[in-house]
């Protein structure tokens, strides 16, 4: 199981996480400099090299948990991608008390 920042799996389940992260590797309307769709995967790969201890707060924030809620892979049109994001957001927002965030390619 791939986890955010390589955190332990017990801190990466939906039940045990306070943060839900969904990636949207979309690059459908860029006209120059294609590659924004690679951003989310590269971000997750780079997160594995991140220090998990926060020296400024003397805490380990990852213990609050980060759930990877999947990838929105719809690429047929901006409208279809937006609808897929909307549906996934509706699904995950039923989890009260959790922070939902998207990380995309093209913004």
Give the role of each language-model region.
Residues 1-107:
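Metal-dependent C-N hydrolase catalytic cores
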């Amino acid at each position: 199981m791939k986890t955010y920042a390589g955190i332990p799996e017990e801190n990466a389940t939906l039940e045990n996480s306070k943060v839900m992260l969904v990636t949207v590797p979309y690059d459908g309307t860029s006209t120059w400099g294609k590659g924004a769709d690679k951003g989310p995967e590269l971000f997750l790969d780079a997160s594995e090299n991140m220090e998990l201890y926060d020296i400024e707060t003397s805490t380990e924030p990852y213990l609050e948990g980060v759930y990877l809620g999947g990838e929105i892979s719809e690429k047929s049109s901006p409208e279809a991608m937006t609808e897929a994001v909307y549906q996934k957001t509706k699904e995950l927002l039923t989890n009260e008390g959790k922070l939902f965030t998207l990380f995309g390619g093209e913004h």
